[in-house]
C-alpha cells in the first residue's frame, strides 16, 4: 500500500469513528432525558409526604 492509500484509509476510519460516536451520543442524550422525566415524576409524587425526604433522600427531594 502506498502512503496516499494508507492516509486515505486512516481518514475514512477517523470519519467513521466520528460519525458513530456522534450518533451514539445523540441516542444516549435522549435516553438520559427520558430517565430524568421518570425520576421527576417519582420525586413529584413521593415528596408530597412529610417523611419522604428522609425515607427517599437518594432522590434529592426538596
Curated annotation (Swiss-Prot):
Please state the span of the N-terminal signal peptide per the UniProt entry. Answer: 1-21
Provide the tissue specificity.
Expressed by the venom duct.
Keyword Secreted in annotation = yes
Q: What is the disulfide pattern of this chain?
A: 46-52, 47-61
Q: Propeptide-annotated positions?
A: 22-40
Which Gene Ontology molecular-function terms are recorded?
acetylcholine receptor inhibitor activity; calcium channel regulator activity; toxin activity
- Keyword Signal included in the entry's annotation: yes
Keyword annotations of the record: Acetylcholine receptor inhibiting toxin, Calcium channel impairing toxin, Disulfide bond, Ion channel impairing toxin, Neurotoxin, Postsynaptic neurotoxin, Secreted, Signal, Toxin, Voltage-gated calcium channel impairing toxin
Family according to the record: Belongs to the conotoxin A superfamily.
Describe the task this protein carries out. The short (45-61) amidated synthetic peptide inhibits the rat neuronal alpha-3-beta-2/CHRNA3-CHRNB2 nicotinic acetylcholine receptor (nAChR) (IC(50)=1.16 uM). It also inhibits Cav2.2/CACNA1C voltage-gated calcium channel (IC(50)=398 nM). In vivo, when tested in rat pain models, this short amidated peptide increases the pain threshold.
Q: What does UniProt say about this protein's domains?
A: The cysteine framework is I (CC-C-C). Alpha4/8 pattern.
Miscellaneous information on this protein = The short (45-61) amidated synthetic peptide shows very low or no activity on rat alpha-2-beta-2/CHRNA2-CHRNB2, alpha-2-beta-4/CHRNA2-CHRNB4, alpha-3-beta-4/CHRNA3-CHRNB4, alpha-4-beta-2/CHRNA4-CHRNB2, alpha-4-beta-4/CHRNA4-CHRNB4, alpha-7/CHRNA7, alpha-9-alpha-10/CHRNA9-CHRNA10 nAChRs, when tested at 10 uM. It is also non-active against L- and T-type calcium channels, as well as on voltage-gated sodium and potassium channels.
| Protein name per UniProt | Alpha-conotoxin Vt1.27
Q: Which organism is it from?
A: Conus planorbis (Planorbis cone)
| Highest classification ranks of the organism | Eukaryota, Metazoa, Spiralia, Lophotrochozoa, Mollusca
Amino acid at each position: 500500500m502506498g502512503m496516499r492509500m494508507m492516509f486515505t484509509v486512516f481518514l475514512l476510519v477517523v470519519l467513521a469513528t466520528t460519525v458513530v460516536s456522534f450518533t451514539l451520543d445523540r441516542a444516549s442524550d435522549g435516553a438520559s432525558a427520558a430517565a430524568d422525566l421518570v425520576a421527576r415524576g417519582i420525586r413529584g409524587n413521593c415528596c408530597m409526604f412529610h417523611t419522604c425526604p428522609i425515607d427517599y433522600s437518594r432522590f434529592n427531594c426538596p
